[in-house]
Regions:
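Bacterial Sec-dependent N-terminal signal peptides
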Residues: 1-22
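Short, conserved micro-motifs composed of acidic
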Residues: 20-299
Length: 299
């Protein structure tokens, strides 16, 4: 069964920091076990805000996440560990003069990617940007992916070891998302290509999260075996480069309403789930059980 292979998937995240040792203390919070519990109240999960997209540096000394009253009015928040103490959450410097959301580290921690409407007349028209880590600071923001179609917005970047960026292209007229990828070659990103995740059912795919080695892709999608609205799915990559049909994560993560995709801690131990305008977390072994129940024995 393919669900068994997911163990290797989660374990790969413990190695994705290229030899760096994760020392993230999870803010001293008690392990949630297999329950979905609120993560870091008043630190990450803030009152009167909608939080999403928790990004932890590969060595665990920096945390970014998006917060705001509601999209598109979002800012990326920043917390850093200095002298064994965490700073108070503050707006990241590159987010001060614009709206930003959905940060994600490159596997080596050298870059932070995110979505922003910086420089756009329509504040909803997000593109993919990144900042580079220079010493202990972050450099000037640089736009790296822009499809240049005013009705298409680029969201939720996720990065592989080779530098390929997976992201969502949202059609603002049709209200439908599709996953695209753009490879890094000769110092620039190639023309984005659509990632085909389904073959028999039309639907919408958003919020990708890719394995650093591109073996698996987690998305929030509609259509196939949905409990209602958007559900969280995982797709496995075949040897020929195509993707198997998505598998639903089941009742533990999906409801009759819309359910966002989730992120995984750099050590592979925890899932971060976004619901009810806050961040929740749970051990990954709960996801393994859920996947086994929903795996397709015919695949």
């Amino acid at each position: 069964m393919k669900a068994v292979a997911i163990i290797t998937f989660f374990m790969s995240f413990a190695l994705m920091s290229n030899g760096q040792s994760l020392q993230f203390d999870y803010f001293g919070i008690k392990n949630p076990g297999e329950k979905n519990e609120l993560f870091a109240p008043n630190v990450v999960s803030l009152k009167n805000f909608n939080e999403k997209s928790l990004a932890i540096s590969p060595i665990g000394d920096e945390v970014f996440f998006s917060a705001g009253p509601g999209w598109p009015e979002c800012k990326i928040m920043y917390i850093k560990k200095i002298n064994n103490k965490w700073t108070e959450p503050k707006v990241a410097e590159f987010s001060i003069d614009c709206f930003t959301t959905e940060p994600a580290f490159s596997p080596d921690g050298k870059y932070l990617y995110y979505s922003s409407s910086k420089g756009m007349q329509d504040i909803k028209q997000y593109c993919i940007w990144r900042v580079e880590k220079i010493g202990n600071n972050w450099g000037a923001p640089k736009k790296v992916i822009d499809i240049a179609d005013p009705k298409i917005w680029e969201f939720h970047p996720t990065i592989t070891k080779s530098g390929t960026v997976y992201f969502c292209c949202w059609d603002s007229l049709k209200q439908v998302g599709n996953i695209y990828q753009s490879k890094y070659s000769d110092g620039a990103y190639t023309e984005p290509e659509k990632v085909v995740l389904r073959f028999d059912i039309q639907g919408s795919d958003t919020d990708p999260f890719v394995d650093p080695d591109e073996k698996y892709l987690i998305t929030s999608s509609t259509g196939q075996n949905s409990k209602g609205g958007y559900d969280t799915y995982i797709s496995y990559k075949k040897e020929d480069g195509s993707w198997l049909s998505p598998i639903n994560f089941g009742d533990k993560f999906n409801t009759i309403g819309d359910d966002n995709s989730f992120d995984i801690s750099p050590d592979g131990r925890f899932l971060f789930i976004y619901k009810q305008d806050d961040v929740y977390w749970t051990e990954t072994k709960g996801a393994l059980k859920s996947l086994r129940k929903n795996d397709d024995p015919n695949e």
